[in-house]
Curated annotation (Swiss-Prot):
Residues making up the signal peptide according to the UniProt record: 1-26
Name assigned to this protein: Uncharacterized protein C15orf61
InterPro entries: DUF4528 (IPR029245)
Signal keyword on record: yes
Localization per record: Secreted
Major place of residence: secreted
Source organism per UniProt: Homo sapiens (Human)
An example Gene Ontology CC term for this record: extracellular region
Taxon lineage: Eukaryota, Metazoa, Chordata, Craniata, Vertebrata
Length: 157
């Protein structure tokens, strides 16, 4: 898994950062987990949220995680996460802690079996249609996250 993670990082660095084009690629970036946590806190721990964060804006510290628990200030979220180039897509639902290891393995295997093609198409579709944005304030500065639909604050669905 570690070799796969490193190969993934190199491919993304070449595709997104274009180190030959600018010095901006070398700037420090927040971790994807920090953006996830800060987004949930900014939204005051919503019942659910679904958003995309650009790969180029974060360090991908959650590589290999597809379905997992994410505790934030006493609340727990079930997070469905997938890399859908050029984004990382998150769908978070507030729910009690549950052992999600089996589902995590299943969703990860499904992405591998499909060669990532459906997630790539989803990412390209998100790139075309995600027009609602929000700024998440991190320890490294602001990060823009994208939504396919405007989310109503406090909505259950």
């Amino acid at each position: 898994m570690e070799a796969l993670r490193r190969a993934h990082e190199v491919a993304l660095r070449l595709l997104l950062c274009r180190p030959w084009a600018s010095r901006a690629a070398a700037r420090p970036k927040p971790s994807a987990s920090e953006v996830l946590t800060r987004h949930l806190l900014q939204r005051r721990l919503p019942h659910w949220t679904s958003f995309c964060v650009p790969y180029s804006a974060v360090r991908n510290d959650q590589f290999g995680l597809s379905h997992f628990n994410w505790p934030v200030q006493g609340a727990n979220y079930h997070v469905l996460r997938t890399g859908c180039f050029p984004f990382i897509k998150y769908h978070c639902s507030k729910a009690p802690w549950q052992d999600l290891a089996r589902q995590n393995r299943f969703f990860t295997a499904l992405k591998v079996v499909n060669l990532g093609i459906p997630t790539l198409l989803y990412g390209l579709g998100s790139w075309l249609f995600a027009r609602v944005t929000e700024t998440v304030h991190t320890s490294y500065g602001p990060i823009t996250v994208y939504f396919l639909n405007k989310e109503d604050e406090g909505a259950m669905y």
